[in-house]
Amino acid sequence: MFNNTIRKTHAIRTAAACVAFALMSAGAQAATDIPFWHSMEGELGKEVNSLADRFNKEHTDVKIVPVYKGNYEQNLAAGIAAYRAGNAPAILQVYEVGTATMMASKAIKPVYEVFKDAGINFDESVFVPTVSGYYTDAKSGHLLSQPFNSSTPVLYYNKDAFKKAGLDPEQPPKTWQQMADYTAKLRSAGMKCGYASGWQGWIQIENFSAWNGLPVATKNNGFDGTDTVLEFNKPTQVKHIQLLQDMNKKGDFTYFGRKDEPTEKFYNGECAMTTASSGSLANIREHAKFNYGVGMMPYDADAKGAPQNAIIGGASLWVMGGKDAATYKGVAEFMQFLAKPENAAEWHQKTGYLPITTAAYELTQKQGFYEKNPGADIATRQMLNKPPLPFTKGMRLGNMPQIRTVVDEELESVWTGKKTPQQALDSAVERGNALLRRFEQSTK
């Protein structure tokens, strides 16, 4: 009798445990995983994970799963390959020069349609116009992707090195002519490297051109048609590359690589100045062991009307096609979460990327962040310096990642002395135009 009672009690407990486990399993299965492939590493990756964790705590039916997939080129290639294989992520972070490629593909679901289908009345006007305009479809007037980590290049400089060289640590060079003078003085004061810069196409061609009121290509840099032609081999751009070549020969400008290698050389104290993404601020803040400042990009003192306005870099979030309704609803909720003023402001403040919404910018001002962190508003001020001209609002060129590679190759031939600046830019334009024609044909 006693043994029977024990057996019955054990059976009841076992059954109860099974029911509980089944309920837990059902609850776990109810949450829809939403893969989010990105290119944010280091401190930036930590912030992406933090945003996802906060969202996931507020939403039990969906789970954002951030996955680092390498740099921008690697992530885009991985996303395209995954789509072709039928296992693309729900959200893919794509850098700004991939915009034309994504627009022309059949792999995406426009973000405005994602909101509409999810029944979320999302106001696209919350985004800063100069940011959202980059990702807006000219025909519908709606966003194709959602701005996320938008940036402009800024000048980072070592204040301690400036003091040692007898330079005012509160006055970074404003023009490229001053840059040449400052780097010579910094080198004379013992700095191994006066100035370094990566992302040559974005900084030394695209943003140099916009900042000095010049087009990179016809058809307003491709916004008005795929039959655009590159034209960055004009006298002002050639003169700029010549100045850098002269600095390079003297040892005042050092080329370390195509991506973020110069940023590391800066925060390690080897280089006195670098032009890099405003989004590099998080890593510089984490690693620099010296006093540093943030200044605007230098401009050409001889360029009429300069400085004009900077054009954005960074990336936006694209929603991939072929997903179910539950996934798209979760994606829409996450996009809405990212655009909330408190979340967009925190992302801006912790990373150095631009405040992508007007409310985030106003909240950051109200919190006194810019007063406590001088220079943190430089990227925004550059972007809003003057109303953009038709050809300084951004770039929308097909095969742009490949064109940037061409620019890298041609400028590297200048730094090694194999070509003159004019020869290199002429070749870059010729090779780039061939890539544009190939893209134009593919869209017909």
From Swiss-Prot:
Pfam families: SBP_bac_8
Primary location group: periplasm
Gene3D superfamilies referenced in this protein's UniProt entry, alphabetically: Periplasmic binding protein-like II
Subcellular location: Periplasm
One BP annotation, GO: transmembrane transport
Matches recorded under InterPro entries: Bact_solute-bd_prot1 (IPR050490), SBP (IPR006059), SBP_1_CS (IPR006061)
Annotated positions binding sn-glycerol 3-phosphate: Y72, E96, S151, S277, G314, Y353, R404
Signal sequence region: 1-30
CC terms in the record's Gene Ontology section: cell envelope; periplasmic space
Recorded superkingdom: Bacteria
Entry keywords, A to Z: Periplasm, Signal, Transport
Subunit structure, as described in the record: The complex is composed of two ATP-binding proteins (UgpC), two transmembrane proteins (UgpA and UgpE) and a solute-binding protein (UgpB).
Function: Part of the ABC transporter complex UgpBAEC involved in sn-glycerol-3-phosphate (G3P) import. Binds G3P.
Family: Belongs to the bacterial solute-binding protein 1 family.
Name of protein: sn-glycerol-3-phosphate-binding periplasmic protein UgpB
